[in-house]
Curated annotation (Swiss-Prot):
UniProt keyword annotation of Signal present: yes
Record-given protein name: Murinoglobulin-1
Gene giving rise to this polypeptide: Mug1
Keyword Methyltransferase: no
CDD domains named among the record's database cross-references: A2M_2 (cd02897)
Database matches in PANTHER family: MACROGLOBULIN / COMPLEMENT (PTHR11412), MURINOGLOBULIN-1-RELATED (PTHR11412:SF133)
GO biological process: embryo implantation
Amino acid sequence: MWKSRRAQLCLFSVLLAFLHSASLLNGDSKYMVLVPSQLYTETPEKICLHLYQLNETVTVTASLVSQSGRKNLFDELVLDKDLFQCVSFIIPRLSSSDEEDFLYVDIKGPTHEFSKRKAVLVKNKESVVFVQTDKPVYKPGQSVKFRVVSMDKMLRPLNELLPLAYIEDPKKNRIMQWRDIKTENGLKQMSFSLAAEPIQGPYKIVVHKESGEKEEHSFTVMEFVLPRFNVDLKVPNAMSVNDEVLSVTACGKYTYGKPVPGHVKINVCRETETGCREVNSQLDNNGCSTQEVNITELQSKKRNYEVQLFHVNATVTEEGTGLEFSRSGTTKIERITNKLIFLKADSHFRHGIPFFVKVRLVDIKGDPIPNEKVFIKAQELSYTSATTTDQHGLAEFSIDTTCISGSSLHIKVNHKEEDSCSYFYCMEERHASAKHVAYAVYSLSKSYIYLDTETSSILPCNQIHTVQAHFILKGDLGVLKELIFYYLVMAQGSIIQTGNHTHQVEPGEAPVKGKFALEIPVEFSMVPMAKMLIYTILPDGEVIADSVNFEIEKCLRNKVDLRFSTSQSLPASQTRLQVTASPQSLCGLRAVDQSVLLLKPESELSPSWIYNLPGMQQNKFVPSSRLSEDQEDCILYSSWLAEKHTNLVPHGTEKDVYRYVEDMGLTAFTNLMIKLPIICFDYGMVPISAPRVEFDLAFTPEISWSLRTTLSKRPEEPPRKDPSSNDPLTETIRKYFPETWVWDIVTVNSTGLAEVEMTVPDTITEWKAGALCLSNDTGLGLSSVVPLQAFKPFFVEVSLPYSVVRGEAFMLKATVMNYLPTSMQMSVQLEASPDFTAVPVGDDQDSYCLSANGRHTSSWLVTPKSLGNVNFSVSAEAQQSSEPCGSEVATVPETGRKDTVVKVLIVEPEGIKQEHTFSSLFCASDAEISEKMSLVLPPTVVKDSARAHFSVMGDILSSAIRNTQNLLHMPYGCGEQNMVLFAPNIYVLKYLNETQQLTQKIKTKALGFLRAGYQRELNYKHKDGSYSAFGDQNGEREGNTWLTAFVLKSFAQARAFIFIDESHITHAFTWLSQKQKDNGCFRSSGSLFNNAMKGGVDDEMTLSAYITMALLESSLPATHPVVSKALSCLESSWKTIEQERNASFVYTKALMAYAFALAGNQNKRDEILKSLDEEAIKENNSIHWKRPQKSRKSEHHLYKPQASSAEVEMNAYVVLARLTAQPAPSPEDLTLSMSTIMWLTKQQNSNGGFSSTQDTVVALDALSKYGAVTFSRSQKTTLVTIQSTGSFSQKFQVENSNRLLLQQVALPDIPGDYTISVSGEGCVYAQTMLRYNMHLEKQLSAFAIWVQTVPLTCNNPKGHNSFQISLEISYTGSRPASNMVIADVKMLSGFIPLKPTVKKLERLEHVSRTEVSNNNVLIYLDQVTNQTLAFSFIIQQDIPVRNLQPAIVKVYDYYETDEMAFAEYSSPCSTDKQNV
């Protein structure tokens, strides 16, 4: 009973469907309204109305309903019976970036009413933003130059305000930030300087748009040496399983296009299994080598593979230098030796319309195979056919689809009718096959339309494309006289073209068949992809449709041409770069050394790259569940219905008109039949799918191949979210070698032309130039990459060591390379100089014959005579000669007949460098004040090494201001030392700003140093927000409490000047807070750098005072809970100190006094200062404090040594405590501070710093605050005179206009006595620096050093050019252990360290860091005790040097710099006269 009832309901539903058709056939009005499913604000959008068989006037209304209300889009009165019209409307900008709304379409007449709603996505019109950098890879310390480009989707420039941009390092630290960036005509050019030691790896430039979306661009920071040449590797893409030999061609070419002399090593390895073949060969005259590598033994013996992959690597080694460069490639060994590629095969078929198939047969190299049989089989039809490929390897088939009963069509195409190697374990070649599946298009009446186009072709812009439309119409067409086909073209989500075609129907024609052509203009607005929909409405209301996608050429309307005035230029010559673009275009130019792109290839800025940007993509809109569409009627499923009315039961793979419309990105409002009948079950609507037909197992295994063209093997990054002189040059002196040559913005004139005159850099290379132009009329334009070869017909290269010691001799070599096809008579000259003697080696120095494409090396044995920097100028000149050059006549090039290279050599005195600085602050009123000074030298001084100069400056910070990045004569390799490069810039900026002396030049320089220091300090940050000496990359398990507090206060103070990511400050503060105990004191984490901070004082007390001070200097109020508890800790600690009156707590008391002063607790500050006064040392008009115990001095001093780091630091804290008095320091505070300042200035070194890092930072803070409080602009001049007991005398005038100027004079008498006199009004800072070298002598020192070379003697032939240096170090001073220690190993002249062996030392437990500078190896040791530490590394000869002098090893305590020791080592062959 229930089943019978169910069947009746189903039949009733079917009848309803037929009644609906009948009603439409009887003349009811038909409506079809099409609108894009995604609508954009502030831009014209179209909605297309198709109203058919109207019998009355109607009004069409469209409105958009959102949570904010209803927006009426248009009201259109329709008077015509039939209407096909598109109406434009504009949606105002949304407050959010997008929202899902309902679009309502209402059609109302006197007797008719149609109303429907559909969900649409409304989006604000978005900009397209991308970033271009001047190059893809940077060295530490270089400037990152980049452009932000902003356009609309039509690629027109936008003047856009971008709220935020920043640079992110590999650790996700935000190291630089900009806000509110305004692009002008679509462009904004910016730059950022990297720190000298940044984190290396991938960096990101991130740009935020107003919508909140962000665009990213990546670049890499790494240490590198630019490759001088490139390696081109050619291997076949694929080979047959029967091939025994792999042909490999490797070529080495210099960046200026000439072949590389040398040899090549080729390695061929299988991917999945072990086994390689290596072949070595010499490069030929073209720089190439082709090798046939036998691979039979490498091929896999397994039988179950389809493809084997072989990796090929070619390493070219340059002759003479040993420089290497590699290139890799892959080749596939395949069992299928030819391929069939589908060029045409639609995804769907239509019953009754032929299904067209076009394939191409290609061989394993991708070349077409003509005159070969190709077989096709269609499983559903039991259809087979064969044809022969034409000359292009093409084969075409047409399959009659009339008799297909199912919903799918499975096709297989074979090269051979039967494959003799179809079983699994076959090792023979297999023949090509390809498969394709097409599914049916749904039509109730079996009527269809089909658009025929070559989908594989790319349509060129600004042309007409013809589309053939085929149709077949069945069913009851009545007395239909004509049929109108309507079409729409969409691109970028909008309707851009519409049209129609009318077909006249012949009386009695059944079925109606035909075809017609549509001509579609290919417009720029269609790039890169357009979709076309065609449909017609049959008399019964059924709609039939088809669609096709067009891939459009990625063209740009702004045609940009870039060219150099010549394709090849001499280095240092003038050239012109000419840009042609749309008038008034703004163009960004770039030219980069090709070597940079060899090192790290990048995606070329091209139209394809632009159209792949995220902002250019069109995503499909799927409504959310809350905006689901109105429920559709459905037919209740029954087996009876399925059996009796199969034409009414669709399969899930069939495609209806609704899907065609949806795939176009359209939404349809209609009362027509465009959708498959939905089968509904008792539990709801479910579309039914027919069982999928599985392909015959005989078709497997197979590989499907798609049409593709490989343009280059070079790896690319994925798309990103990234006037010339007419006079020939006769001589060039080359010294300018940039990596980026051109990075500029120019505007083309009204005729569309711009010319830039520029000088070609000195690098002999190929420059790659490109232009990006933006026009308000034509939008974006890109030039192709334009090369300029900077090349000389011949040039000279000079090699010499970085430095030598006086008395040593070395071989200076000059190699001349001739790349002309003719020979030249050459003359090579080393310019004479009184600074050295040079003896030619060989008898061809004056003149020799240099053959075509040849090279020749001339040598001189050079012995320097002067100390310091010595210039060597080598010139190579082609000369006129009547004598034949070999069998040829010698030629002289028209341009560039002379090449000159100037190089500098540092000549150092032998022995150990010593420096003494005598600094004084003179404050004169009216009476003249004077001071005597004696310069004396030790008996072991090295002859002629002494030099001295006297400096006068008008400001207390002048020296430090000039040397903010060189305050110490020490390395800066750890997190604490780096802060001396950072913090002093804050004090300098504050001081100069308060005293109104800040110039733009000083400000720019200081801000640059702050940004670099900020970047570098992030290297030492731990994941928990703390900081340590060497960061967490060296395995340090915990951060350092003291350093974290130091970084916290410095970052907080720097916020006033540069961008500091607030998260770094917050994380550091949180970590410190977690270290606070219940009593308010702080637990120590990590070791103290300077154990003088202990000095009999409770570590926790001193550390807590320092952290409290740092928190207060970070602008935290004294009432903050953490600070308040910390101050309670200090008050308790002060009580303990008062009770222990016999102990000395000078360092801790100085810190506490400053902390209480910062907190505003004047009483406690005064108490502590009074206690300190009792321990003060008052002498020579100065007041200072000393430590109770001092470390043992390492030698007898000629001069009173500088105070230790801790003593400078605690005296500076006393000054800061006095100057921080509230509301202002009293006259007594200023007077007492002045007395301590006098003592502090005498401790300064020649660069304005002090003994070490922390004392330099604190003392400069004190000096800057004192200078600001006491600053005055005197109208009078201060006169400074220095005179010797002999005839020397020099006067200096200091006034407001030259306060910051360094005035200096060399002192002639060493040894000698001098008098310094100061008269006038005001304070001046005077400094004398004495430097000399002294011979190493045995002395009592705080360290024991033992140095030895391995081998010890020259008996081992390796001792000539490479040997090991072994060191043993122990501490012999008065303390249990040293502070951090630096072992500074100077290189022998002409030798360089083998970097991997130095880096390997960092694996040792006691080595924290190593550095390799120009001429030194620095080894950082955590601390040294009486236990001997041993380590070794290897050095190798770079340039031969004769009469090698010993090199010095210096070991010293970083914070107690008078604790040091020296040793020396010699080459095992130092006395070997054949060392050169």
